[in-house]
């Protein structure tokens, strides 16, 4: 450091000490004036004395605190001027730091990013309404298998006959082993005969069911009343008369020719 700088610092600190002394003298004079104001005509009270003693103690504590802070500031300025590193106490740093309102609060949640958000309540409701197997409340549509008399590749009779042919061919290809006996052959023949009889019975039952359906239709026709039959005949005659346009035109031409003659 230069001599000029050292001189300025010493002079600055001397001025600060002089200012402190003057402030202390001014405070003492003010306290004396207060005492004179309260002690008029030589009257004094013990309570006032106690209050004054407490005020003096508090004022002395405040003065000591102010001096302590002032010395700390002066030491800090000295360390900064000398360029030396000095540890700063935590209390001074805490006093100089700003309030927490400027800083981020840890209690606040982090900002939300633009992501897909599923409506979980709606999903749970849909899962509750759904069932493992969807039930159909509508009535079943009647399905009648159409059996054509012609034996095509898709007809039922053709497929049954084809299946029987293949089964017979497989039975013939099976070779007889040494362990097979005559009794086994007889049992196989009996089983084949039983199968044939069952198939014949099924065919007869099927034919009977078809004939029964036709009989039912005939019975329904017979149950119709005579009034319905008469109404039907009238309707048929009116429909024929309405759609037989050729006859109507011919009759009109005949009438015109008669009028001209």
Swiss-Prot record:
Molecular function terms from GO: protein phosphatase binding; protein phosphatase inhibitor activity
Name of the gene this protein is made from: dpiA
Keyword terms of this UniProt record: Coiled coil, Protein phosphatase inhibitor
Residue spans of biased composition, Acidic residues class: 17-60, 212-225
Biased composition (Basic residues): 195-206
Lineage: Eukaryota, Amoebozoa, Evosea, Eumycetozoa, Dictyostelia
Family affiliation: Belongs to the protein phosphatase inhibitor 2 family.
Entry protein name: Protein phosphatase inhibitor 2
Biased composition (Polar residues): 123-134
Organism superkingdom: Eukaryota
Organism of this sequence: Dictyostelium discoideum
One GO BP: intracellular signal transduction
Reported function: Inhibitor of protein-phosphatase 1 (PP1).
């Amino acid at each position: 450091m230069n001599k000029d700088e050292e001189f300025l610092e010493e002079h600055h600190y001397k001025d600060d000490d002089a200012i402190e002394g003057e402030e202390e003298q001014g405070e003492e004079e003010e306290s004396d004036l207060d005492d004179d104001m309260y002690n008029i005509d030589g009257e004094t009270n013990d309570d006032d004395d106690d209050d004054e003693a407490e005020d003096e103690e508090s004022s002395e504590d405040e003065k000591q605190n102010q001096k302590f802070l002032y010395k700390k500031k002066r030491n800090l300025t000295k360390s900064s001027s000398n360029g030396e590193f000095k540890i700063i106490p935590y209390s001074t740093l805490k006093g100089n730091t700003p309030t927490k309102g400027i800083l981020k609060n840890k209690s606040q949640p982090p900002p939300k990013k633009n992501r897909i958000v599923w409506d979980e309540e709606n999903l749970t409701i849909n899962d509750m309404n759904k069932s493992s197997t969807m039930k159909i409340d509508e009535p079943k549509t009647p399905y009648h298998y159409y059996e054509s008399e012609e034996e095509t590749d898709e007809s039922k009779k053709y497929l049954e006959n084809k299946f029987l042919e293949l089964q017979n061919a497989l039975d013939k290809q099976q070779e007889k082993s040494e362990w097979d006996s005559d009794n086994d052959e007889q049992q196989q023949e009996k089983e084949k005969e039983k199968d044939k009889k069952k198939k014949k019975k099924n065919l007869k039952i099927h034919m009977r069911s078809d004939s029964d359906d036709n009989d039912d239709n005939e019975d329904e026709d017979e149950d119709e009343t005579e009034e319905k039959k008469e109404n039907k005949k009238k309707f048929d005659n009116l429909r024929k008369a309405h759609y037989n346009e050729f006859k109507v035109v011919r009759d009109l031409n005949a009438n015109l020719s008669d009028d001209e003659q």
